[in-house]
């Protein structure tokens, strides 16, 4: 029996005239794509033949190109078949949504552009390094560009890659371990472009970084596609003030919420970490070892230390129903509500079987989620209230087709990517709970 619920309508945000001829996507979820007043949205589009960053004024219906890329896609994490040292680093683009400045890598240059398209070169990427998703501090003063020894992606995508994205056949993190490859947290002054410091993280492949929202001396970073111990190695903190780095998630059976009896284990899969606005908590999700998917919260108290001299941490995790096994991402609004592009299953609905050539990473879940949902957590009770808002119907084929939903700053809308046919486009849906339509 189909017991489908009412849904809201999705609205096309990207250019409707060219929706079938070019791709348009949000910036990566570790930063917002929206101005503080939610009037302008910053997008990556290849409408002129090459990926560039565009500002779309949603109230006036105008567009402005902010970058000047004419060399395709730079090779980096998730864009494995890009060109070495040439092109736009699609993974590098991040927005200072308060001052409306974008930061990005063009060829080997670290650049900044304002909303009027005034471009300034801040610095350069050192030779022999590979870059990934960058991040700007909330106060707008610092830019962190994660880099790794170039050997990490030293391969020919055409002969040594596989899948739609041509990722290498070798285990990337294992190469970092075996060959002693390092990552570097490179932090720059956003005005002068000066390198403020560079922290070496040994035997590590960093692809995601996020400044603490209230303390730019603290950076959260990841170990991407961990070859071992993903349950504890994935999420990490570097405290520049104390010059220490450490894993955030620990093993243990003291988890609050509702883990359905699963203890935290190094053999779990953990992913997509993000700060809450106050910097007191880190949200993440993943799956228990031979168990269900889960979403978690780590409260981290930087004012008190444990027996190891590290900040006191407490964990809440909520195990999902067994049938909620569709890969997705959890993002948060400014009020603590989550949104998700996967996991949820509409009761009674037949699951669409998808042939996902990118479904070959370390995660244990299927890439066949079809809904944008609003998820209201009660961490202490260990419950999640799922509200399906609309279908995104993306095919999940490649990073750019991952919906990666984000809230408007006002919390009233959710924006997401979707490829329903041949191209990726950006849509929005109301975050209000859908209402039944009653006949009178």
Predicted regions and their residues:
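A short helix->beta-strand "capping" segment at the edge of beta-propeller domains
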Residues: 2-27, 386-390
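Beta-strand-rich domains and repeat architectures in extracellular enzymes and scaffolds
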Residues: 15-53, 91, 209
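Residue position within the beta-strands of beta-propeller blades
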Residues: 40-44, 103-105, 142-146, 218-224, ...
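Short, conserved, GDST-rich strand-edge loop motifs in beta-rich repeat architectures
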Residues: 46, 87-89, 145-180, 221-233, ...
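Asp-box/WD-like beta-propeller blade repeats and closely related beta-sheet repeat scaffolds
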Residues: 70-184, 195-201
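Conserved blade-ending motifs and adjacent loop-strand segments that build the rim/top face
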Residues: 250-257, 313-331, 381-407
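Loop/turn-rich, solvent-exposed surfaces of beta-rich toroidal or solenoidal domains
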Residues: 276-295, 318-385
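Blade-level signature of beta-propeller repeat domains, shared across WD40, Kelch, NHL, RCC1
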Residues: 401-440
């Amino acid at each position: 029996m189909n017991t489908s619920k009412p849904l809201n309508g999705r609205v096309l945000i990207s250019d409707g005239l060219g929706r079938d001829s070019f791709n348009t996507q949000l910036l990566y979820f570790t930063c917002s794509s929206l101005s503080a007043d939610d009037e302008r949205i910053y997008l990556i589009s290849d409408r002129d033949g090459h990926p560039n960053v565009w500002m779309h004024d949603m109230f006036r219906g105008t567009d402005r190109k902010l970058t000047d890329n004419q060399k395709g896609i730079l090779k980096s994490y998730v864009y494995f078949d890009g060109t070495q040292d040439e092109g736009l680093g699609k993974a590098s683009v991040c927005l200072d949504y308060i001052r409306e400045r974008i930061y990005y890598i063009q060829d080997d240059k670290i650049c900044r552009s304002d909303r009027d398209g005034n471009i300034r070169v801040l610095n350069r990427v050192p030779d022999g390094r590979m870059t990934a998703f960058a991040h700007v501090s909330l106060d707008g003063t610092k830019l962190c560009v994660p880099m790794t020894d170039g050997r990490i992606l030293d391969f020919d995508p055409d002969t040594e890659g596989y899948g739609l994205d041509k990722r290498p056949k070798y285990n990337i993190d294992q190469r970092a371990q075996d060959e002693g490859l390092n990552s570097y947290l490179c932090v720059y002054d956003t005005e002068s472009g000066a390198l403020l410091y560079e922290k070496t993280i040994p035997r590590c492949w960093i692809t995601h970084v996020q400044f603490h929202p209230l303390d730019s001396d603290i950076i959260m970073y990841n170990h991407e596609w961990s070859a071992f111990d993903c349950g504890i190695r994935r999420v990490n903190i570097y405290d520049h003030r104390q010059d220490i780095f450490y894993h955030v998630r620990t093993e243990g059976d003291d988890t609050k919420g509702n883990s359905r009896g699963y203890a935290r284990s190094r053999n779990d899969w953990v992913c997509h970490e993000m700060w809450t606005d106050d910097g007191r908590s880190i949200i993440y999700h993943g799956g228990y070892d031979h168990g269900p998917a889960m979403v978690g919260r780590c409260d981290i108290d930087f004012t008190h230390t444990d027996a190891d001299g590290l900040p006191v941490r407490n964990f809440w995790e909520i195990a999902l129903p067994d049938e909620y096994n569709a890969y997705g991402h959890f993002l948060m609004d400014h009020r603590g509500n989550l949104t998700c592009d996967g996991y949820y299953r509409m009761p009674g609905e037949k699951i669409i079987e998808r042939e996902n050539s990118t479904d070959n990473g370390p995660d244990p879940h299927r890439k066949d989620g079809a809904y944008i949902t609003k998820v209201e957590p009660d961490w202490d009770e260990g419950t999640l209230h799922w509200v399906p808002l609309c279908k995104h119907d993306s095919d999940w084929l490649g990073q750019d087709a991952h919906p990666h939903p984000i809230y408007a700053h006002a919390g009233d809308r959710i924006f997401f990517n979707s490829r329903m046919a041949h191209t990726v486009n950006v849509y929005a849906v109301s975050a209000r709970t859908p209402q039944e339509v009653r006949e009178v």
